[in-house]
């Protein structure tokens, strides 16, 4: 092997270093002349080799554009196999940016800008720190990592768009389970016997239909709660990704409660016959629909991003939602 400061020679292959990244070239001999043919980023070549060795793709060498450009697809072929190879090349190139500094900044971005939970953020960091797999966590993580890098001008928007087009999040199997009123009542009683604080969380979940993370957030500053005419609402205005709650509607006035999501998880672990708190949300949506609350209003109350209503008109639904919520509040009085 011969080398200089930025060039390493291994037989007929050259490895060049550029800005901390490595690129592979192959020496080719033609009419007595030696030419260097660009093969691709080292990470692409290694990952493609491993994929081919495992039988994931065929045996055609990966082709890519010269350094400074995003990986090309001239040697990728067509059809499903070509699409898979392009994805491998794109993901391999993206992984080169998973440096310690970028990973730390990405974690801060997930927690502070995207509002993602600590556990989920750590799962995403774990996903981009390992070779890409076709799992929902990895798919979401790589897409978010591409968005993050583009937002910091570390990669071009065009490259981020290629990642978003190539890496799709596979749909999860639909969970159609909706608990019965009897199951809800039983869980509330179990929660009350377990802890008054845990019971309070479950009660607000039943009244509001919002997520556990949102309930815990409003209980940090309960003094912002507004009550009147048998209905209370909390101006939360918390959005992240596809989730966004403007107001938390409920009946029981809020109070400061020292409880964490781990306490809820512990309760659910200890009481296998209790309904998980996430299903309270589904029960609320189902009951509101039974009470003829419009679907758009249910979405607004439960903090789903609008699909049937334009975003600019979404926040104006507050007055309508407040009146419609009274139907559910009346029903709750008998529970």
Swiss-Prot record:
It comes from the Viruses. Keywords: DNA integration, DNA recombination, DNA-binding, Hydrolase, Transferase, Viral genome integration, Virus entry into host cell. InterPro entries: CB (IPR044068), DNA_brk_join_enz (IPR011010), Integrase-like_cat_sf (IPR013762), Integrase_catalytic (IPR002104), Integrase_SSV1_C (IPR031857), ORF_D-335 (IPR012922). SUPFAM superfamilies: DNA breaking-rejoining enzymes (SSF56349). Residues 97-189 form the Core-binding (CB) domain. PROSITE patterns: CB (PS51900), TYR_RECOMBINASE (PS51898). Its EC number is 2.7.7.-, 3.1.-.-. Residues 174-329 form the Tyr recombinase domain. Residues 62-82 are annotated as: Disordered. The keyword DNA-binding applies. The active site is at 211, 281, 314 (o-(3'-phospho-dna)-tyrosine intermediate). GO terms for molecular function: DNA binding; hydrolase activity; transferase activity. GO terms for biological process: DNA integration; DNA recombination; establishment of integrated proviral latency; symbiont entry into host cell; viral genome integration into host DNA. This protein may encode a site-specific integrase, which is necessary for integration of the phage by site-specific recombination into a tRNA gene of the host chromosome. Essential for virus infection. Belongs to the 'phage' integrase family. This is Integrase. It comes from Sulfolobus spindle-shape virus 1.
